[in-house]
Amino acid sequence: EALKAAAGDDELVEIRVLPTRYPQGAKKQLILAVTGKEVAPGARTGALFNVTTVYSICRAVYEGLPITEKVVTVTGEGANEPKNVIVRVGTPIEQVLDFAGGVKEETCKVVCGGPMMGVAQGNLAVPVVKGTNALLCLTDPAPAAEDPACIRCGKCMDACPMGLQPLNLYRYVNCGDKEELGRLNLEDCMECGCCAYVCPGRLPLVETFKAGKKLLKEGKR
């Protein structure tokens, strides 16, 4: 309601309320939800910006200011005082955690980003960058894969928002078949983690697909 009030009668602004659904914030999913049009694999889309990016563009254009600070959410069971903090870009992650009250002794991992697409940090001396939006402090170690072999149950295919075939992509990455990876549109994978989340064997699907994308890039050089 506040956004609608701020937009007023401006014909160039339309406020659309969408249901909370992961990963609806991704570019292609957002276009489908708002316009009803599906973006074909490999096709280009229009320019989409989140609120933070729009704010940064406004400051750059009207005030001549670069991105110098970020709002970072410190959260998770391992965080002593979960909170949002305004952080200077370049600040080491360990200093951000200390400022936010530190972490508990049982914290085993700090993830930069969210629980589904975040990346575990092996070194907390690395700096906050313009893409840093959250620090997730975890106390439970990730369960290891029960069996490295895919049982081809198909749950990953049902979960994939891009309509890909994770079970086949997993196999072709492991055998290095670039032709099949290209045919099955591996590059359309957004690494959302939905497939890994539902996998009963806890296979490292996202990590495998990242390696597969590197394999395809190397083949294009």
Name each region found by the language model.
Residues 73, 84-86, 95, 111, ...:
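Structured core elements
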Residues 134-147, 157, 161-221:
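Ferredoxin-type iron-sulfur electron-transfer modules in oxidoreductases and energy-metabolism complexes
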